[in-house]
């Protein structure tokens, strides 16, 4: 078990991501069944690229719990900004298509319209660049994280 005083921002981010998933899962399942039962229309968006940037703060805002989480972190003396910055940016594309896909998905979530985004589940994002002995070297960007799905 990780003690709060010793937890890194990445460990706190991972724990918070798990709590968020548990928080919305039942509602998501109920809504999905209601959509099916009522034969409501659902938007489906397909894209081979997705460039959403960091999503933690937007997701907390859309769930209506951003202020609650910030207050809780303040009580625990945890720097919320550090945790937000610990989120790995999924670089799953390199241009306009990825940003467009992310904007569509964000709009659906923010407005509450039912929709699903579909794409390829890449193990690695865009490559990372490093300079080694004066030469540029490309390395894989393992965006998946320790849990494989945060």
Role assignments for model-derived ranges:
Residues 1-150:
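A conserved ligand/cofactor-binding region detector
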């Amino acid at each position: 078990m990780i003690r709060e005083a010793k937890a890194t921002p990445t460990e706190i981010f991972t724990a918070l991501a798990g709590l968020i998933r548990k928080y919305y899962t039942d509602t998501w399942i109920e809504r999905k069944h209601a959509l099916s039962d009522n034969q409501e229309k659902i938007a489906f968006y397909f894209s081979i690229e997705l460039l959403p940037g960091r999503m933690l703060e937007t997701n907390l805002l859309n769930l209506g719990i951003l202020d609650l989480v910030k207050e809780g972190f303040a009580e625990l003396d945890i720097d919320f900004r550090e945790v937000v910055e610990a989120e790995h940016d999924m670089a799953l594309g390199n241009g306009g298509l990825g940003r467009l896909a992310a904007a569509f998905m964000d709009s659906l979530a923010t407005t509450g319209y039912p929709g699903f985004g579909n794409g390829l589940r890449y193990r690695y994002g865009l490559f990372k660049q490093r300079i080694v002995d004066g030469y540029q070297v490309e390395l894989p960007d393992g965006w998946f994280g320790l849990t494989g799905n945060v």
